[in-house]
Structure formats: structure tokens, C-alpha cells
Amino acid sequence: MTNLRKTHPLMKIINSSFIDLPAPSNISSWWNFGSLLGVCLIVQILTGLFLAMHYTSDTMTAFSSVTHICRDVNYGWLIRYLHANGASMFFICLFLHVGRGLYYGSYMFLETWNIGVLLLFAVMATAFMGYVLPWGQMSFWGATVITNLLSAIPYIGSDLVEWIWGGFSVDKATLTRFFAFHFILPFIIAALAGVHLLFLHETGSNNPSGLCSDADKIPFHPYYTIKDILGVLLLILVLTSLVLFSPDLLGDPDNYTPANPLNTPPHIKPEWYFLFAYAILRSIPNKLGGVLALVLSILVLAVIPFLHTSKQRSMMFRPFSQCLFWILVADLLTLTWIGGQPVEHPFIIIGQLASILYFLLILVLMPITSLLENHLLKW
């Protein structure tokens, strides 16, 4: 008799995706982050669901409802901090996942890569709207500053901002709609992640060498299920340590002050995972130019497959490209640091130089270096 997992319509899909899936025999721990992102998404949806049971999306009671969750709801503090720090873990995994894709040439799977870029935008939008919900000082002013950027769009900018606000400033209507969108978007992200996997399983996974691995495939279960479980355990260890020992490490103290439209915080800044993009935005003195640079800092990922000039897929055997990749990583860390600093000398010039270097590396230096490596190998 044929095994049920190979005949049952539902089990067949699960079987071909997680059990009998042929996987390259040499994929390293850098390939663990896809499953970790799935776990992060599940954690965020579950904790978010329980938070939504007690949260009220009204400007008068939003801040109090979050305080109520932390003080009066059974394990409410745990759920709240798991959700807040879960977002940080989500972005750490996201950045490492994208970095892996860049290093090993996974972007050559065009459909998978483009869905991934779309997912990145969706997760960033969700995180931004989630940050507004506690209605602290940084929530309110962050929402005001970021939504105001849309006013830089010619002709329709001002109308667009007022349409998003639902009035003439960030107020009750804004908070209510942000809560609605923040609730629905994770489910859209889950659906997109399904499409992401669908496209990936059409081509099969890439591997560190960047070479075709069809001649040497192994079943996903038990080899990579065990490997993924180890990754998940490490993720849970890091997340619980963060939540139980220093839950406010990655947050902003200003958000423990209720939102006050009459009092501007000295330094308005987003959560740490947006600081690199915020630094690029601030490095351009022109409003529209800054907004374009902000969008392009993420959208540039979609262009990378078309700038691949090397005859090798992976950077594993390309030392010059490796150097540029790690310079790019250092540059992004520099931008993250600059994004959290006040707008004054020397931070302004450092931010501008780091922003120029970011685009220069991706759009110019990396493609030229790849051509040089081809030439050195006489290809």
C-alpha cells in the first residue's frame, strides 16, 4: 500500500515541500534563516493575536491599554515583549537571509528573489505601523515624520498625506487604520511566503558553491528538518534571553511617555532595523530626493540580478567580490549607527559618504569587479 503522505491531496503538498524535497547535500547554516523567518512570522501572528484581544485602537486609551496588558493581563508582559523583540529577531533573520542571497548568488532565481523583495517591503510596512500602535512619543512623532514624507510627491503629495491620516494630522483615524492594516498584513505576508516557497521549489535550492547540485541531492527529512530544529532552538534561546533579561534593550525610552502633539522629542528616530534607510533619507538635503533615496535603498535589491556580470554564480571563489561584500556590510552597520545620531557635524558628512558608498558598491563597483575577475580567470 502506498504511504498516505504520498497519496492524500493535502499531505502530498506537505510531503513534497518538507519531507521528500530533494535538497543539495552541502547547504550550510546560512540556509537556516528561511525556516527561522517562518517561525518568527508564526510567533508574531500568535503573540499579536493575543495582544489584539486586550488592545484598544483609540488615542485616549491605546497607551493605557498597553500598560494594562503589561500589568494586569496574565503573562501580558511576556506576550508584549515577545512581540516587540520578536520583530527585532525577524529583521535580524531577514537581513542575514538577504545577505546570504547576495553572497551566494541566490538572486539568480528571479521570481523567488522578487517575491522576497516584495516581502521585505511588506514586513517593513507592517513593523512601521506596529510601532505606532502603543501611542508613545516616538510612535506619534515617528508616524508624523514618516507619513509626512509622502507630501514630497509632486501634485498629489499633500492630498495623499491627508488621505492616509484621515484628517489634518496624525490622530484617532490614523491609529485605527494602522491597527487594521497591522492586523491584516501578516496574513498577506504568510500568503506571499507561500508563493516565495512555491517558486523556490520550482528551481530547487541554491548551494554555497553556486554550481548545479542535481547530481547530489538528499531528502529534506530527516537531514534538514533536524538542522532547522537546531536553528529554531537557538533562535528561541536568543529571543527568550532578550525578553527575560533586557526586554527594553532595543526599544526607545521616549515610547514610555504618552504621545503629546505639543512636545517634540529631541531626536526623532525609528526602531534600529530602519536606521540604515533613515540615515540614507537624512543624508540628502532635498525632501523628494531623500524619499527617492529611501525607497531606492531597498528597491535596488530588485536590480541586482541584472547587474550580475560574473561567470560564476556564488562569491565563494571570488576574493575581490568578497572584499566588496564585507565593505558593504560594514557600510550598512555605519549607516545604522549614523541613523541613531543627531543631525550635526561630523555625523552628517559620514552619513552622506556612507550613503554614496552604498549605492556605488551595488550599482558600480561590484559589477566592475566581477568583470575583472572574469578577465583574471581568462573567461
From Swiss-Prot:
Claim: Repressor is one of the keywords in the record: no
Pfam families per the UniProt record, alphabetical: Cytochrom_B_C (PF00032), Cytochrome_B (PF00033)
Subcellular location field: Mitochondrion inner membrane
Binding site for heme b b562: H83, H182
GO MF annotations in UniProt: metal ion binding; ubiquinol-cytochrome-c reductase activity
Keywords assigned: Electron transport, Heme, Iron, Membrane, Metal-binding, Mitochondrion, Mitochondrion inner membrane, Respiratory chain, Transmembrane, Transmembrane helix, Transport, Ubiquinone
Co-factor remark: Binds 2 heme b groups non-covalently.
Cofactor: heme b
Transmembrane segments: 33-53, 77-98, 113-133, 178-198, 226-246, 288-308, 320-340, 347-367
GO process terms (BP): mitochondrial electron transport, ubiquinol to cytochrome c
Residues at which heme b b566 binds: H97, H196
Location (main, coarse): mitochondrion
Membrane topology, as annotated: Multi-pass membrane protein
Residues annotated as binding a ubiquinone: H201
Annotated GO CC locations: mitochondrial inner membrane; respiratory chain complex III
Family: Belongs to the cytochrome b family.
PANTHER family, per database record: CYTOCHROME B (PTHR19271:SF16)
Function: Component of the ubiquinol-cytochrome c reductase complex (complex III or cytochrome b-c1 complex) that is part of the mitochondrial respiratory chain. The b-c1 complex mediates electron transfer from ubiquinol to cytochrome c. Contributes to the generation of a proton gradient across the mitochondrial membrane that is then used for ATP synthesis.
Note: Heme 1 (or BL or b562) is low-potential and absorbs at about 562 nm, and heme 2 (or BH or b566) is high-potential and absorbs at about 566 nm.
Subunit structure: The cytochrome bc1 complex contains 11 subunits: 3 respiratory subunits (MT-CYB, CYC1 and UQCRFS1), 2 core proteins (UQCRC1 and UQCRC2) and 6 low-molecular weight proteins (UQCRH/QCR6, UQCRB/QCR7, UQCRQ/QCR8, UQCR10/QCR9, UQCR11/QCR10 and a cleavage product of UQCRFS1). This cytochrome bc1 complex then forms a dimer.
Protein name as it appears in the record: Cytochrome b
Organism: Sorex preblei (Preble's shrew)
